[in-house]
Amino acid sequence: MQRLAMDLRMLSRELSHYLEHQVRVGFFGSGVGFSLILGFSVAYACYYLSSIAKKPQLVTGGESFSRFLQDHCPVVTETYYPTVWCWESRGQTLLRPFITSKPLVQYRNELIKTADGGQISLDWFDNDNSKHYMDASTRPTVLLLPGLTGTSKESYILHMIHLSEELGYRYVVFNNRGVAGENLLTPRTYCCSNTEDLETVIHHVHSLYPSAPFLAAGVSMGGMLLLNYLGKIGPKTPLKAAATFSVGWNTFACSESLEKPLNWLLFNYYLTTCLQSSVNKHRHMFVKQIDVDHVMKAKSIREFDKRFTSVMFGYRTIDDYYTDASPNRRLKSVGIPVLCLNSVDDVFSPSHAIPIETAKQNPNVALVLTSYGGHIGFLEGIWPRQSTYMDRVFKQFVQAMIEHGHELSSM
């Protein structure tokens, strides 16, 4: 490492002398434009390779899980090369929804009933053409949980399915109540602390295919919900393993970060309007218990949660809700192998709130922390239209757990 630093300093000095010489030549000759462009390109490449492209930090609670990931999910130990012209957190976060493609995935929709009379929309990708698992009863099943206002149509969900389709697995996307176009039958939506709907979905899917390996993956709020479920239930779950991406570990820290002026302008206010739009669509269902007009005046996610979410789910205060919603406090109780990918520059999930010490105390948990990637960004390649680093981590981990998961118990 010291040798590399010395080489970079020497290269910088030589580059400085070169640029100075070229500028002098350019003033009295020609070609200064090309020389400057070449020089700055070399300088940028040196900076990128030395400061931006880095291997992720792998934090595990046990040596066995660490060795397992190194052997069967090597992407978590390889250098992550963010898109060279867009590696900053906000840039990655903003760009991904617009630049990544949306692969065609043919879903089969199913509406299931809940105990309170509501309904949940599930979108299935059965993968009936699977050459590896032709018997549907034993075909591995992966449950996907989208983010705060997301559905099965999100590009990151589509890419997770598309990239892994060749593995032959079956996928089912859990759409939260009222967001996927279905009618809201009861005055209740969703939040990341109440796991009742997720428990209903997991029970339903497992009852359909009890002999099939069953895994789950959650993105952003979907990951928070999944971790809260796993922390509550411990090892008594039909899930074999799980993965989360861009989880907000401490809801208070997330809210504080998103309320900073620039983050509020770029992300917070927009997401608040998305939440309000969903409420307004089903306004007639809430008028008896919620002051909807007051909710529609909220200017931040925190204000929305104070006026709507915390009230709907019976919390005395917004602080009570945010405490219960934070998955960091339940991580120690997770009883199955879980891989959690976060970027330390994610403004939705500040690095200081990532529970590194707690993860070290649970042999079932692995944190994969990249230096860059933003929130559900993880763009890579010159023109990042296709799969991301997150998609590759998902594919390798799911495949590792389904094909080699038995090795963990023997390590």
Swiss-Prot record:
**A molecular-function term among this protein's GO annotations:** monoacylglycerol lipase activity
Q: Does the keyword Cytoplasm apply?
A: no
- Keywords, comma-separated and alphabetical: Hydrolase, Lipid metabolism, Membrane, Phospholipid metabolism, Serine esterase, Signal-anchor, Transmembrane, Transmembrane helix
- Give the main localization category: membrane
Q: Which SUPFAM superfamilies match?
A: alpha/beta-Hydrolases (SSF53474)
Please state the Enzyme Commission number of this protein.
Answer: 3.1.1.32, 3.1.1.4
**What class does this enzyme belong to in the EC scheme?**
hydrolase
One biological process term in Gene Ontology: phosphatidylcholine metabolic process
Where the record annotates domain AB hydrolase-1, the positions are: 140-247
Residue ranges annotated as transmembrane are 25-45
CC annotations in GO: membrane
Q: Where in the cell is it found?
A: Membrane
Q: Which residues form the active site?
A: 220 (charge relay system), 346 (charge relay system), 375 (charge relay system)
Give any Pfam family that matches: Abhydrolase_1
In what way does this protein cross or attach to the membrane?
Single-pass type II membrane protein
Q: Which reaction does it catalyse?
A: a 1,2-diacyl-sn-glycero-3-phosphocholine + H2O = a 1-acyl-sn-glycero-3-phosphocholine + a fatty acid + H(+); a 1,2-diacyl-sn-glycero-3-phosphocholine + H2O = a 2-acyl-sn-glycero-3-phosphocholine + a fatty acid + H(+); 1-tetradecanoyl-2-(9Z,12Z-octadecadienoyl)-sn-glycero-3-phosphocholine + H2O = 2-(9Z,12Z-octadecadienoyl)-sn-glycero-3-phosphocholine + tetradecanoate + H(+); 1-tetradecanoyl-2-(9Z,12Z-octadecadienoyl)-sn-glycero-3-phosphocholine + H2O = 1-tetradecanoyl-sn-glycero-3-phosphocholine + (9Z,12Z)-octadecadienoate + H(+)
Coiled-coil segments:
none
- Main role? Phospholipase that may play a role in phospholipids remodeling. May selectively cleave myristate (C14)-containing phosphatidylcholines through its predominant phospholipase 1 activity, cleaving preferentially acyl groups in sn1 position. In parallel, may have a minor phospholipase 2 activity acting on acyl groups in position sn2. In addition to (C14)-containing phosphatidylcholines, may also act on other medium-chain-containing and oxidatively truncated phospholipids.
Similarity-based family: Belongs to the AB hydrolase superfamily. AB hydrolase 4 family.
The protein's name is Phospholipase ABHD3
